[in-house]
Regions:
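Bacterial Sec-dependent N-terminal signal peptides
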Residues: 1-23, 46, 91-93, 316
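Residue-level "micro-hotspots" composed of small/polar
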Residues: 19-41, 47, 69-82, 120-125, ...
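Residue-level detector of Asp-centered blade-edge/turn motifs that repeat once per structural unit
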Residues: 41-44, 86-89, 134-137, 174-177, ...
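Conserved beta-propeller blade signature
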Residues: 46-49, 91-93, 139-141, 179-182, ...
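Loop/turn residues immediately N-terminal
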Residues: 53-56, 98-101, 146-149, 185-189, ...
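Short loop/turn segments that connect beta-strands within beta-propeller blades
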Residues: 59-62, 105-109, 152-156, 192-196, ...
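Asp-box/WD-like beta-propeller blade repeats and closely related beta-sheet repeat scaffolds
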Residues: 111-131, 445
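Solenoidal tandem-repeat scaffolds enriched in leucines and small polar residues
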Residues: 130-132, 141-149, 164-173, 180-187, ...
């Protein structure tokens, strides 16, 4: 019998991404229920959530739900879904108030019932367990007012000891292998568990504390016990001086739900109603850290935190009853500017087609419902030409271009509505026809896609039919026949203009009016945006052809698209720059930073918290204060130009679901080729007749999961790399006997 030896080699295609402070996970993302009670991270890196419906596993992209089965009956009531722990050996445990203990069986990818309280204990008592806990000795505690049921997960033996405390246990913190702090509904106790006997150790300072304890946290380095209560604030027991202190945390009117380490010197305190607080373990300085901001669309979205998990710079929160909220401390936040229904002190419409900053630093937004002006000094909004403005006579409210033609005078180019002139000082808008500057009959434009002011002070207007140069001060106008379908206009130098159109790129001589068509190495010639860097390179954002960089001196192009770089869209809508250190590109599903010196791309998508991610053509500006603002179909976003992402990122590739003849096989099962889990298998040996099989590949990544692509090859069978794909299911049918790598 010949044996088949397989090795799989995978290549990883990815892009670094900008993320945002908060990310929200709900049922629409795959979470089984918005009511989340506990969060853990498993040894492989999966995040595990205990919800009202059961247990969910999350890899950054996909959720998988697990059923808890007892004698072929699913136990999914709230009484069976209470605590989730990871043991010292990395095993995942679930404990319910009904007294059932489930262990995660990694080999078979399921939860297995390993112990439950005797029927006589459960009968007549819907919640026989007041608290479930697993200690560092891998002993599961099922705490009852009359007895403690201790299940040894190593020997699988159960021991029942009398509960000498005589109170309902609410929390346990382990000090060392034999000593514990035990919180109850009336106080805190110091106890020793030795030879299966629980003895209370008298402690005057603790025994005199009379309060309902919700949460205990023992800071081993400082030997301090932090005691979270129900509406009585936060207390501290210092084992070094044997004293109890009431801490001035200002949490007397809320319930403290969880206390965990944040770093070596700080702890985080979660509450049911006041968000998360941060406290220094030495000075006891306590400040609000994560608190709901209901005035922002992209900030913390709730204050009832049932549990949280500190995962490096990322904090996962069970935000009851909303779902999971993830805060990432690596990244700066951004401002999301949106329309608020019925509120005139907001953006007039969320479809933002153009943005400019005027000479006074105020912001103008062209939308599908008129123009919005935001005063940066007074923080006030004012709208023009919208359906909300009284006395407005225009029937068309869609505007797609803006330009400050002289201080305080704004031109707004419309869609089938010509140009309107807004006098900022007088707060008046009126229809304006630049053709009145000329004696010739100039055909009205269907739309005005681009209006800009060149270095000589001339105004350029580009529309469906015409390209016009307008001397606003002298009231002269000049047309350039032969150029139409204008999409963007920028100045090359004092003598030339770059003209982007629906049919390609042109270089125009201002004086002579002659223009040169620039042949581009792409099939789709529609240009969305142009930007010229200080070194003369022209960046061209196209529709469905990616990014072109044109070197005019050498008459050469550099072409970037989805198939040859980490760009995740070939539709480049807006191009802005931070003094050429980086080039910012907006697309229909991301923002992308391109770094010319390194020729690398970094993407920022909805997965990383970018709430508004479908951007509009030529809609953006770099402000004088160093902030970028970009317009989208869902408002505008503003962030500082220096906001960057770390270049160190983590992912873990997972091999799973080995199927032979279309049936999943597990280690140790009869006929299975696996001795250990497929993810831990180095050499896969198959019998000659096991030549129809498949294998699934996935990754654990919480920053950019949708940007991961997989490619594979099997030397000796398929020597070339497969086409990169987002999902990777490798199938083999009738593979010939032999050795493959």
């Amino acid at each position: 019998m010949r044996k088949l030896v397989l090795f799989f080699i995978f290549t990883y295609f990815s892009a670094l991404c900008i993320a945002q402070t908060y990310k929200y996970l709900g049922v629409e993302d795959g979470l089984s229920n918005r009511r989340v009670y506990a969060i853990q991270k498993g040894p492989k890196g999966y995040m595990w959530f205990l919800t009202h419906n059961g247990i969910d596993r999350y890899d950054g992209k996909n959720f998988k739900q697990y059923r808890l089965i007892d004698s072929e009956i699913e136990v999914n009531s709230m009484l069976n879904l209470s605590w989730l722990y990871v043991g010292t050996d990395g095993t995942l445990w679930e404990i319910g108030k009904k007294g059932r203990v489930f262990r995660y069986d990694a080999k078979h990818d399921r939860f297995q019932l390993v112990y439950k309280l005797p029927d006589e204990v459960v009968k007549g008592n819907p919640t026989p367990v007041s608290y479930g806990f697993i200690d560092s000795n891998n002993i599961v505690w099922l705490c009852n007012e009359e007895a403690l049921y201790l299940y040894d997960t190593n020997s699988e033996k159960n021991t029942v000891i009398e509960n000498h405390i005589g109170e309902s246990i609410t929390d346990i913190e382990q000090i060392d292998p034999e000593h514990y702090f035990i919180g109850t509904d009336v106080g805190v106790h110091h106890a020793e568990l030795k030879d299966n006997v629980l003895n209370l150790s008298p402690c005057h300072w603790l025994d005199n504390l009379k309060m309902q304890v919700n949460e205990l946290y023992f800071h081993k380095e400082s030997r301090k016990l932090f005691i979270g209560t129900f509406q009585k604030g936060l207390y501290l027991y210092d084992m070094n001086i044997h004293q109890t202190i009431k801490l001035n945390a200002g949490l007397e009117d809320v319930s403290i739900t969880r206390i965990k380490a944040f770093n070596d010197k700080e702890i985080l305190i979660a509450t049911d109603g006041a968000g998360v607080y941060k406290m220094n373990v030495d000075t006891y300085k306590c400040d609000p850290y994560i608190v709901a901001d209901y005035n922002s669309y992209n900030a913390m979205n709730g204050n009832s935190i049932y549990d949280f998990y500190v995962d490096g710079d990322r904090i996962w929160m069970a935000n009851y009853p909303i779902g999971i909220t993830v805060r990432n401390n690596q990244y700066a936040s951004y401002q999301w500017i949106k329309h608020s229904i019925g509120n005139k002190q907001s953006l007039v419409n969320d479809q933002v087609n153009a943005i400019i900053e005027d000479h006074e630093g105020d912001l103008w937004f062209a939308t599908n419902n008129g123009i919005s002006l935001y005063s940066t000094q007074t923080k006030q909004w004012h709208s023009f030409l919208s359906v909300f403005d009284s006395g407005n006579v225009t029937k068309n409210h869609v505007f797609i271009s803006l330009c400050e033609v002289s201080p305080g005078i704004i031109w707004a180019g419309g869609y089938s509505s010509g140009i309107y002139q807004i006098n900022k000082k007088q707060m008046k808008a009126e229809f304006f026809t630049p053709s009145t500057f000329s004696d010739s009959d100039i055909r009205p434009d269907k739309y005005i896609r681009s209006i800009m002011k060149d270095s000589a002070g001339n105004i350029w207007s580009g529309g469906y039919y015409n390209l016009k140069q307008i001397d606003f001060s002298r009231k002269n106008i000049r047309t350039y026949p032969g150029l139409n379908g204008i999409t963007d206009i920028i100045e090359k130098d004092e003598k030339h203009m770059w003209i982007g159109t629906a049919t390609g790129l042109y270089l125009l001589d201002k004086e002579s009016g002659e223009f040169q068509y620039i042949s581009m190495p792409i099939e789709s010639f529609y240009i969305n945006a142009l930007y010229q860097s200080d070194n003369g390179l022209l960046y061209i954002g196209t529709s469905n052809s990616g990014l072109l960089i044109y070197d005019y001196e050498n008459k050469s192009f550099e072409h970037f698209h989805k198939d040859n770089c980490p760009l995740i869209s070939n539709n480049i809508y807006t191009i802005l720059s931070d003094e050429d250190q980086s080039i910012l590109l907006s697309t229909e599903n991301s923002l992308t930073s391109y770094y010319p010196s390194e020729k690398v791309f970094h993407n920022w998508t909805k997965e990383q918290g970018l709430k508004s991610d479908h951007f509009n053509s030529a809609s953006g500006v770099l402000r004088k204060n160093g902030n970028f603002i970009l317009g989208s179909t869902d408002g505008a976003i503003e962030f500082h130009k220096d906001m960057m992402i770390p270049r160190n990122y983590k992912f873990q590739m997972i091999f799973s679901d080995l199927r032979v003849f279309y049936q999943t096989v597990y280690p140790g099962d009869e006929g299975s080729p696996l001795e250990v889990d497929i993810d831990e298998t180095k050499v896969l040996k198959l019998k000659y007749n096991q030549n129809i099989f498949s294998l699934r590949i996935s990754s654990i990544n919480y920053d950019y999961p949708s940007l991961i692509l997989y490619s594979w090859k099997l030397e000796g069978f398929y020597d070339g790399w497969s086409r990169p794909e987002k999902d990777c299911l490798i199938r083999f049918t009738n593979l010939s006997p032999g050795k493959y790598t």
